Amino acid sequence: MDDILFFQTEGDVIHAHKKDDIYETKYKLYQLEEMLPGFFMRVSKSAILNTNHIYSITRNLTASSTVTFAGTHKQVFVSRYYYKPLISKLEEKRLHQ
């Protein structure tokens, strides 16, 4: 579970993305959200990411943001609704390290 970067919907299918692989999962995002450890976080209606693998967050002019992960070209979009909670979660993690 630790090596999963994010889960993302693609049509009716949910994919688990690792650095170099993609796997299909049978669960819906809302089910994953309830089952996953606390270092995973919903960041849009179509994505849940692993906060342990965030390399950078870039805020766009449209108020949405893009998260990149170290060692891969993969990225996830964060809706403006989830941006502040994500930043708060990362700050909290940083303070408890």
Question: Which residue stretches match the model-derived regions?
Answer:
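Charged phosphate-binding loop/patch that engages nucleotide di/tri-phosphates or the phosphate backbone
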Residues: P85-Q97
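Short, charged alpha-helical segments
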Residues: F77-Y81, P85
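Conserved binding/recognition cores within well-folded domains
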Residues: M1-V78, Q97
